[in-house]
Amino acid sequence: MARSAYSYIRDAWKNPGDGQLAELQWQRQQEWRNEGAVERIERPTRLDKARSQGYKAKQGVIVARVSVRKGSARKRRHKAGRRSKRQGVTRITRRKDIQRVAEERASRTFPNLRVLNSYSVGQDGRQKWHEVILIDPNHPAIQNDDDLSWICADDQADRVFRGLTGAGRRNRGLSGKGKGSEKTRPSLRSNGGKGK
């Protein structure tokens, strides 16, 4: 059976540091470093991933590339005194993962749009880049689309800030079931934050 074009794209992205994609990514990242933190782009970098996440090349659907710093929290050293245990500056991490941060920043930049999903497109020593798929819930092309019209409902407003995207659900521990996931449902807060 003949392979689809998407399967070749998917195979190339399994090891983006090797082969032809490595040179292409090297050139891309030089351009990305000179761009802003949130940039609207014409078309997805990873078409296979974007399509699997719900992207369609139609009106009302846009893609934005977001860069977020890598590593742990950026915490300033305290000026006032405190005991050693409370003086921590390094090795303090946020409970929210970088992909979620990227989605939220894109949503704040485009407040009239709703985040559908996102995926990674690369990283260097300082930052990670994600592409975020955003949907216009007021566009007739979206309201009449059988696959995307659900995002127009009122209960999907601010969905990214409530952890309802794929990255948000993973970050809340909702990707697993059974043993080890007892404290993640119905929510982390209802279990005293013991789920993570």
Curated annotation (Swiss-Prot):
GO biological process: cytoplasmic translation
Annotated transmembrane regions: none
Region (Disordered): 72-93, 163-196
A molecular function GO annotation: rRNA binding
Record's GO cellular component terms: cytosolic large ribosomal subunit
Entry keywords, A to Z: Ribonucleoprotein, Ribosomal protein, RNA-binding, rRNA-binding
Pfam families, alphabetized: Ribosomal_L15e
Entry-linked SUPFAM superfamilies: Ribosomal proteins S24e, L23 and L15e
UniProt record similarity statement: Belongs to the eukaryotic ribosomal protein eL15 family.
Subunit: Part of the 50S ribosomal subunit. Interacts with protein L7Ae and weakly with L44e.
Protein known as: Large ribosomal subunit protein eL15
Organism: Haloarcula marismortui (strain ATCC 43049 / DSM 3752 / JCM 8966 / VKM B-1809)
Native organism taxonomy: Archaea, Methanobacteriati, Methanobacteriota, Stenosarchaea group, Halobacteria
Gene assigned in the entry: rpl15e
